[in-house]
């Protein structure tokens, strides 16, 4: 039996994927697995029972990923599950920035008591006029699941699309339209594009990457969109760029006192993945990954440990080891098992940076004593008897 805990509301469609072997607990330190969306976990102390955390979404900056790794806690996310929902909002953001649709709606609402509203509308509509996005140049920084979908949709809307991503995956590249132009530098995006949208994770290297230096390289009257992470844009520099006319509009999904209600800025209340479909997709993907990990020891879409898939165990026993990626670990594991008279029938070992993960299928059941001896090896974070 396994227990799970939800730090945020999780779509029922996902929770219904859990079999009768799973029960929900209100105590996080009784849980084998934790499901989370936006709740901040950095100040939480997690007990030894917690084996995995699944973020129903892509970003994991609300989770202490490195600290979890050292506790042997695998952190999962759900890349691509909410991509279409975010993509649609980005496209909507470009349209809202191109024509004063919001201003027009507000103006009409203010005239609701006037009999001649139709005639007034004809006289006043020119103040809300704008431009079409067809034929304009769109620069996309980051061509992951969301960025690639934005790129393809924008081409269908008649935009000339430039993409920059030095780390693009082969799968993402294959999914891109052939009409998308490959930019070799951010400077090319800045200097060429009428619209720029950001789709990168928040890292030390990307924090405030859109700063004064970047704005200085952009075309006058550029439209900037940020539906990725709030700290990617230096908002003090942004305000100056808006006041100078360098930036025409800034559209963001991240509200704060500096940007809310300011002229030239459109702010939505973190609606990117707030669609029924996105929430369902994220929840289903998160639950499937947790179940496969807890029941089989397999890892898919982890942000700290490597992907590792040994399928379903057909032998007498299976154990998994979360450990440091350092020399001589495997030889120490096999010695402990050999000394206990345990024969290894299959082994899968994968590494990711400083971390590694090993799945061992064995011909005889594993005792708690053997697991204890494996855990005592320097560099081992967690040993789990899966079967």
Predicted regions and their residues:
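Oxidoreductase and adenylate-handling cofactor-binding alpha/beta cores
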Residues: 87-106, 152-159, 285-298, 334-338, ...
């Amino acid at each position: 039996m396994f227990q799970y805990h939800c730090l945020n509301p999780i779509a029922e469609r996902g929770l219904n994927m859990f079999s009768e072997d799973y029960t929900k607990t209100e105590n996080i330190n009784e849980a084998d697995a934790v499901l989370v969306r936006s709740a901040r976990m950095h100040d939480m102390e997690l007990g030894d029972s917690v084996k995995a955390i699944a973020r129903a979404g892509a970003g994991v900056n609300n989770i202490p990923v490195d600290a979890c790794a050292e506790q042997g806690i695998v952190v999962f996310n759900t890349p691509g599950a909410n991509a279409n929902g975010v993509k649609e909002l980005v496209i909507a953001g470009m349209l809202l920035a191109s024509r004063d649709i919001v201003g027009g709606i507000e103006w009409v609402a203010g005239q609701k008591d006037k009999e001649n509203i139709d005639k007034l509308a004809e006289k006043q509509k020119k103040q809300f006029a704008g431009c079409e996005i067809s034929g304009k140049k769109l620069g996309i920084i980051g061509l992951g699941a969301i960025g690639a979908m934005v790129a393809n949709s924008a081409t269908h809307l008649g935009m000339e699309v430039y993409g920059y991503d030095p780390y693009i995956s082969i799968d993402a590249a294959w999914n891109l339209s052939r009409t998308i132009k490959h930019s070799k530098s951010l400077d090319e995006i800045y200097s060429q594009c009428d619209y720029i949208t950001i789709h990168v994770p928040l890292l030390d290297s990307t924090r405030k990457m859109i700063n004064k230096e970047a704005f200085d390289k952009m075309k006058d009257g550029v439209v900037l969109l940020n539906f990725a992470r709030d700290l990617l844009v230096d908002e003090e520099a942004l305000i100056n760029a808006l006041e100078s006319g360098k930036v025409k509009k800034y559209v963001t999904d991240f509200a704060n006192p500096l940007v809310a209600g300011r002229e030239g800025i459109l702010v939505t209340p973190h609606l990117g993945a707030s669609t029924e479909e996105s929430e369902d997709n994220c929840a289903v993907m998160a639950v499937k990954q947790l179940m496969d990990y807890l029941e089989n020891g397999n890892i898919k879409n982890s942000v700290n440990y490597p992907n590792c898939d040994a399928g379903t165990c057909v032998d007498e026993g299976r154990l998994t080891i979360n450990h440091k990626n350092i020399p001589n670990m495997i030889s120490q594991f096999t010695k402990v098992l050999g000394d206990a008279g345990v024969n290894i029938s299959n082994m899968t070992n994968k590494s990711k940076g400083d971390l590694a993960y090993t799945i061992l299928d064995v011909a005889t059941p594993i005792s708690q004593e053997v697991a204890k001896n494996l855990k005592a090896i320097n560099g081992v974070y967690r040993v789990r008897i899966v079967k």
